[in-house]
A protein has these predicted regions:
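Active-site histidine-acidic residue metal-binding/catalytic motifs
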Residues: 6, 10, 14-96
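Loop/turn elements at helix/coil->beta-strand transitions in domains of secreted/extracellular proteins
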Residues: 23-25, 75-82, 106-112, 150-153, ...
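Active-site-adjacent mobile loop/cap segments within catalytic or ligand-binding domains
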Residues: 25-28, 112-114, 118, 160-222
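Solvent-exposed loop/turn segments at secondary-structure junctions
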Residues: 33-36, 81, 87-91, 117-122, ...
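A short, glycine/acidic-enriched catalytic loop
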Residues: 36-58, 118-150
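Soluble non-cytosolic domains of exported or imported proteins
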Residues: 57-65, 90-94, 133-138, 198-206
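Mature extracellular/periplasmic domains of secretome proteins
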Residues: 93-109, 171-177
């Protein structure tokens, strides 16, 4: 995708926010990894095994499907939001963070959420923040609780040693963004039962709905 077209897509998303009355927060949505262009996945790795039925999940496709749903639901609820990566190419972490920080410089309402599918042979969902106690921790707890409520069938992976359920990691998008930032790992794409949920359109709707319910609660804290 040409640079001019990317700028138009970003501006279109920004203009969409301007038309609506301002919400208390503006959600910057990061759909991690690349999408699929002409049948070719744009990111090395970041995919499930090929399952016995022949299907294979590409994480970047899943992430975009969830982020697109979340954005539409937020639009319907009048909550400002911006998809940081409208293109299908695999945009670098540095560029993603730069786009987010530029938005925050001009609009201090911004909060950041990166959506992913997990890997490593486990099961369940988890929410990450940067190390230490920050405002992100409160947001992560809200995301965690909504996912736990929506998905009782999924293992709620948590670390309560510091008093809250989020896990901490030095992920680039968490430590280099200026605003409160969380990263959601929805379920494991390399575990068959979890991956079936990641494929499911019904469960994709549930993942998105839980995120939006959490954002509505975060909005009320501003």
């Amino acid at each position: 995708m040409k640079k001019g077209m990317i700028t138009k897509l970003l501006n279109k998303s920004k203009n969409k926010c301007k038309i609506m009355a301002k919400s208390k927060c503006k959600v910057l949505l990061d759909n991690g990894h690349g999408g699929i262009i002409n049948g070719i996945y744009q990111t090395a790795g970041k995919r499930s095994p090929v399952w016995p039925d022949g299907r294979q999940l590409f994480e970047g496709e899943f992430n975009r499907a969830i982020v697109n749903r979340v954005s539409k639901l937020l639009d319907n609820k009048g909550i400002d939001n911006l998809i940081l990566v409208p293109e299908l190419t695999d945009v670098s972490l540095g560029t993603r963070v730069s786009r987010a920080n530029k938005e925050y410089i001009h609009d201090k309402r911004c909060i950041f959420l990166s959506v992913h599918a997990n890997a490593g042979g486990g099961t369940g969902f988890e929410v990450f923040t940067s190390p230490g106690e920050t405002k992100s921790d409160k947001h992560a707890t809200i995301y965690f609780n909504e996912y736990k409520k929506e998905f009782p069938e999924l293992r709620a992976r948590q670390d309560i040693t510091d008093g809250d359920p989020d896990k901490e990691a030095n992920y680039y998008v968490l430590v280099h963004t200026y605003m409160p930032a969380c990263l959601m790992e929805c379920a494991f794409m390399d575990t068959l039962q979890n991956c079936k949920m990641l494929f499911s359109e019904t469960d994709r709707d549930r993942f998105a709905s839980a995120i939006v319910t959490a954002i509505e609660k975060i909005e009320k804290t501003y």
